[in-house]
């Protein structure tokens, strides 16, 4: 899921292709396109990919206050909020690089805390991506790294994927009567266990704390092989994010929904 992919995807981003999106994370607007949607992400590399015409990107950091973001969005006339980035797979058939467009958002308490997504916008996302699963996504507040816990969460919620942002944004969007959608790419499949070092890497600004990861690898070198697998999965997920972001175009397809 998003927190888990922090290590692998950020590693892939920095080593393989980070030069493509070194632009500063900021209010992103191109002169010809008024910002119409807020894209909420959890990681710095996701923010770089999400940036584009018609999009105000917010990276979830220690200082990110969603209520303030939503109030600003309403005041500036934004019309939608989208949760974009990586997720952990819960459905057994999903592999790294597979897409999930949320039909609803649950939280870890189960389906009774269900929040709907915008039907028209979600259909537009499905059409633009071309190959994606339309299913619930569950949001959690703490990492879900073990396959057994992923299976348990899937049974409890019926969700196909899990992240740590969508449930927060869905709640705020509903409170402020903004259209909401979520589109996430799987990085760690349901069968993949995420090693402890992969959970240590994030700094408050959403970037990788490589030193913390390396210290943990030195202390527990048996993690090296699992981390290599995560990095390969993350590369597949990141490649898909770059491809799909181009397909979604200005405002993540919202203007055409």
Where are these regions (language model features)?
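N-terminal hydrophobic/helix-forming segments and targeting peptides
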Residues: 2-21, 26-29
């Amino acid at each position: 899921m998003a927190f888990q992919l922090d290590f692998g995807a950020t590693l892939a981003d920095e080593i393989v292709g980070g030069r493509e999106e070194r632009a500063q994370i900021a209010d992103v607007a191109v002169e010809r396109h008024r910002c119409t949607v807020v894209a909420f992400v959890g990681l710095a590399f996701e923010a770089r990919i999400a940036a584009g015409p018609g999009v105000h990107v917010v990276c979830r950091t220690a200082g990110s206050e969603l209520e303030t973001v939503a109030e600003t969005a309403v005041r500036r006339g934004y019309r939608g909020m989208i949760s974009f980035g990586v997720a952990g797979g819960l459905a057994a058939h999903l592999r790294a690089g597979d897409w999930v467009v949320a039909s609803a958002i649950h939280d870890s308490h189960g389906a009774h805390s269900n929040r709907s997504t915008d039907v028209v916008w979600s259909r537009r996302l499905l059409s633009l991506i071309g190959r994606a699963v339309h299913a619930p996504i569950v949001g959690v507040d703490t990492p879900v790294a073990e396959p057994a816990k992923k299976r348990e969460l899937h049974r409890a919620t019926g969700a196909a994927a899990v992240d740590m942002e969508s449930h927060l944004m869905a709640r705020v969007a509903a409170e402020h009567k903004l259209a909401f959608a979520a589109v996430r790419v799987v990085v760690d499949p349901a069968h993949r266990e995420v090693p402890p070092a992969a959970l240590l890497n994030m700094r408050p600004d959403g970037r990788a704390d490589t030193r913390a990861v390396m210290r943990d690898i030195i202390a527990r070198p048996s993690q090296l092989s699992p981390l290599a697998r995560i990095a390969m999965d993350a590369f597949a997920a990141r490649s898909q994010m770059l491809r799909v972001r181009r397909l979604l175009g200005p405002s993540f397809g919202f203007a055409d929904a």
